[in-house]
Amino acid sequence: MSVGILGTKLGMTQIFDKETGIAIPVTVIHAGPCPITQVKTPATDGYNSIQIGYGEVKEKALNKPKLGHLKKSASTPVRHLKEYRLENAADYQLGDGIKVDLFKPGDLVDVAGKTIGRGFAGYQKRHNFKRGSMTHGSKNHRLPGSTGAGTTPGRVYPGKRMAGRYGGTQVTIRKLTVVQIDTERNLILIKGAVPGKPGNLLSITPAKTVGK
């Protein structure tokens, strides 16, 4: 795996390609700087990784175990911690920062975050089931239809698509393109949409698979 960066979704806008004039929809993400709060090596933990923090808060917002952990790296109090496994963590030191210059325009990235929670939703909204006839006399407008067979097996199989909570799950959108980097304001502009609503916490890493 590769080192990534944590950020917050600010919203969407559009920029124009200087050569073609085509409007490009982009998501603006405020990312970093993320201090390195822990370095793990095979000698200490059995594997290589670094832990980074994001989202400065006051000390009173954190509990004592977390404050004690952060004081070992002399890091400022941060709300979120995230670990990235590496092949070799010797190149990183406690207190170093991960910034948006980790990426450059044209890079492909994977963006992970929590989708917008939509609460308890029905079959059509949650699973795109076909709606029943809306004509006079129809008693099936938004019903699910059959949920299984008869006496055998005599039960509904686990995993059957039914009504329930929709959204609010961790997802990863892969191979998005970095359009622009603003190192002064710690901003990354990524082509297309990313999970969640404005204010959502995101993890941005170099694309795991590159190609078709």
Curated annotation (Swiss-Prot):
The keyword rRNA-binding applies. It comes from the Bacteria. Keywords: Ribonucleoprotein, Ribosomal protein, RNA-binding, rRNA-binding. GO terms for biological process: translation. Residues 130-158 are annotated as: Disordered. The keyword 4Fe-4S does not apply. One of its GO terms (cellular component) is cytosolic large ribosomal subunit. GO terms for molecular function: rRNA binding; structural constituent of ribosome. It holds the Pfam family Ribosomal_L3. Belongs to the universal ribosomal protein uL3 family. Part of the 50S ribosomal subunit. Forms a cluster with proteins L14 and L19. One of the primary rRNA binding proteins, it binds directly near the 3'-end of the 23S rRNA, where it nucleates assembly of the 50S subunit. HAMAP family: Ribosomal_uL3_B. NCBIfam families: L3_bact. This is Large ribosomal subunit protein uL3. It comes from Gloeothece citriformis (strain PCC 7424).
